[in-house]
Amino acid sequence: MSINILKTLGDGRRYMKTWPMVRQLGLYFPEYRVVRATQLAILVMPVLAVLASVSQLYTYGWAFLPQALTIALFFISLPLQGLLWLGWRARHPLPLSLFDWSNQLSAKLTAMGIHCQSLGAKACYLDMALILKIAFERLDASYWEEL
């Protein structure tokens, strides 16, 4: 079980780095907001965990050490929850509508001479993110304004 959780966290980290951070995709996919929130949480939550724990220990003394540790663990768990969701989403199979749209995008990239793998039968959101990342790097902005 713990290996599966670590694999899911790793998948979430990879998916977070792969997903193109383009505002237009935020209208269609929740990943844009989740990735932004998780990146912010990775930076801010450890500091908030230390501040909350230290302030509670300073105010109430060592008798409140269990409560201070609980608060610290809560703050530290927030970015992990984002990574777990992203990891779950990365391996989640694509719906047929997104599968067709991703295959059309892949075909358009291949027609332009850009090496891009078409999606297989077990395509997942991570595969779509790879295609989207290549597409946003190579296609002009007029294509994305049509969305």
Curated annotation (Swiss-Prot):
Q: Does the keyword GTP-binding apply?
A: no
Protein's membrane topology: Multi-pass membrane protein
- TM regions (residue ranges): 40-60, 68-88
Q: What Pfam family is a match, any one?
A: DUF412
Kindly list the places in or outside the cell where this protein is found, as annotated in its UniProt entry. Answer: Cell inner membrane
InterPro entries from the xrefs? Answer: UPF0208
Q: Which UniProt keywords apply?
A: Cell inner membrane, Cell membrane, Membrane, Transmembrane, Transmembrane helix
Q: Name one GO cellular component term.
A: plasma membrane
Q: Which family does it belong to?
A: Belongs to the UPF0208 family.
Identification of the protein by name: UPF0208 membrane protein SO_2914
Source organism (scientific name): Shewanella oneidensis (strain ATCC 700550 / JCM 31522 / CIP 106686 / LMG 19005 / NCIMB 14063 / MR-1)
